[in-house]
Amino acid sequence: MNNNGTTNETDRKLNKEADMPGTGENKKFTINISVRNLVEFIMRSGDIDNRTAGAMSKQAMAEGTKMHKKIQGRMGIEYKAEVTLKIALEYDNYCINLEGRADGIIAEDIVVVDEIKSMYADVMKFTEAQQVHQAQAMCYAYIYAKQHNLDKICVQMTYCNLDTEEIKRFRTVYTFEEIEVWFESVMAEYIRWADYIADEQKRKMDSIQHLEFPFEYRNGQRNIVVSVYKSILAKRNMFIQAPTGVGKTISTIYPAVRAVGTGEVDKIFYLTAKTITRTVAEEAFEVLRRNGLHFRTVTLTAKEKICPCDETICNPDKCKRAKGHFDRVNSAIYEVITHESSITREVIEKYADEYEVCPFEMSLDISNFMDGVICDYNYVFDPYAKLKRYFTEGITGKYAFLVDEAHNLVERAREMYSAILTKEDFLSCKKIVKDRSKRVSNALDKCNREMLSLKRMCIGTSDRYSYTILDETEDLVLSLLRLQTTLEKFLDDNKEFDKRDEVLELYFAVRTYLDIYELVDSKYVIYSDFNEKGEFFVKLFCVNPSGNLQDCMQTGIATMFFSATLLPVNYYKELLSGDIDDYAIYIDSPFDTHKRLVSICKDVSSKYTRRNENEYIRMLNIIREVVSGCDGNYMVFFPSYKMLEDIYELAIREGFTEEYEVFCQTGSMKEKEKEEFLATFDVDRDKSLIGFCVLGGIFSEGIDLKNERLIGSIIIGTGLPMVCSEREILKNYYDENNRNGFDYAYRYPGMNKVLQAAGRVIRTDEDYGVISLLDERFLRRDYRQLFPREWNDVKVIDSKNAGEIVRHFWKYV
């Protein structure tokens, strides 16, 4: 037995620590569902149609809430507003808790249940209540009538226009027998879904009781498993720094599944930044299924990627799947969930084709019935892409978030919580709508004038890093608020016109800006500048996204951040969770350090002042010396495409490409080209293969070239991001907040790219390889202190002894 313990011992300890319950022989399983979710799921029909301004903006929702209260306040003392209604429905093997809140109960001769819906549509043209709205009110009416022993009850639908405040009402009186028969018919439709949920729950919980870790633990792996498990049960976030090859995916998924078995977690969200890591997560869940786990997962794919149409235009006139989608989708969902456990992209596409439904929308609905959801960060953290069904403001769930390759989340989150407006877009849209709506045209003109005023304040014209920090943009925001309301109504009233998509795009940009503006605090910088086209823009730049991410994390119970490159961990704590006291563990590499050589070349540098042909020749010679030590496959990572191209041209001239086969990454590789590039590393060759790649690009992380597919990673430069306005803003911001601004803006992001590229080598116990860092700056303490602990045996080389040291390594390895 090693010091990490055997698999069975660890599983027994987890059982003891959890005091895992049984499946509940004496207590029925409970299904909780809201009235609104019930009727919207069971009674939906018709088409997908995106030819509106989309979901109501926060401003419109706020206006709707105000209108609700206004209407309720006018109704008199007999009107009781916001009445919570709930009922427990007992079935053989489970109980359904149905709950909702009626907008109003009116005490008249016949009690009236009032349901209010506010909108920008012309409600005076309505001839009857919409079916789903009526059904929601009827459910409330049934619950109230049953609990108050009423013979009759009235349902009132109140529709109100947010612009004109015009109101139209529809009243229907039901006997209790009528509404009971109707309600039972609705529940009869839902029962097959409830039966499925209850049966799956029992099978899942039973299987978890006997689930063991599927492998013998590697060094450090048990530590991850136990730490993740304890953190979830303690409802604490944790950061896990663990090198490639430890098995981070299975080591986080397994304890999260065991936590599901305790009842502390209902659903696991496995969050990734790249498609390849989603596949690894799918495989990990599949390994557990082969070991007896009954656990259903779905992988969500971006709409643009999974859409089968040439253009992603979601309306019945442009897409045959959108037409009648909601008439067919429930049958498709039931077929999928009753026949599949691992619902991958391919599975989604297969059933979506069969039932002619939108694969993206179907996958979101399927997630409701799943135990695990594998998806991009966006679906949990992005304010617009996040799954509203789980992460609506004020609603929490028993969710565990597993964040893979968490180092990527810093920049992704900055993008999610920033917003930008470009002055020229207002002028372009004004030209489109000027003959259609004077009101919209005037609102656009007002915003353009506000942008022009800010432009005059901008100190820059053609100077580098000529941004201007803005203390406030309140006048612009007021104009944007008026424009948003005007555009929302205009787009709802005008479903088809030339260049409508451009107007819709501006509407979304304005809405995003206003929503993000509400989040602006001390962790934001508002600035203006000119883009590469010379266009003036204003940006709300989120320099520290931790507060926004924390709001999202609080919708679940615990978040596990893990990566091979979370150094220094306090930097990531500060920018991701905002809590320096969050748990953290460091896992040492399980691999034999004698099987790899890490070296630093002391007489080259990629500094801008040193970028010349002489320096490039020296770099090329060192690459030749490193590669000559052993025939095989290598990757060389350059700090930019420009340097890659310059050195490649030099390699041709110097005869380097005759000695070795060289393939170059290009700036616009499609998925197929990426696969072809990686496939070159699978072919046996007479001479060494060298891939010229860009540091921080698609081949420097997230690829898995095991065994002899890659035996060397040569990294040129320290990975520092290019100096630009936003990097300088970050640097100044952190300097002003008592941090080392250069570290936060440049050094830490750069070293992360270096460590990721180095991690492409040594993926398994059988691997051998060399990692060569070609830049004298790596010898400095401020860089070496960012090295992983296992790099304590780094060798210093130069252009004279590099070949000798590398050949010595390969001779005795």
Give a label for each model feature.
Residues 604-612, 668-777:
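Conserved RecA-like P-loop NTPase helicase motor core
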Residues 234-254:
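Walker A/P-loop
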Residues 353-368, 384-391, 490-602, 615, ...:
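A contiguous, basic/glycine-rich beta-loop/short-helix subdomain that forms a polymer-engagement track
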Residues 2-110:
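Metal-dependent nuclease catalytic cores that hydrolyze phosphodiester bonds in DNA/RNA
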Residues 201-239:
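Conserved pre-motif I regulatory segment
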Residues 205, 211-212, 264-373, 378-381, ...:
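A substrate-engagement module of RecA-like helicase motors
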Residues 87-181:
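Mg2+/Mn2+-dependent nuclease catalytic core
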Residues 355-356, 360-372, 377-478, 566-578, ...:
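Signature of the SF2 helicase/ATPase Hel1-core->accessory helical subdomain module
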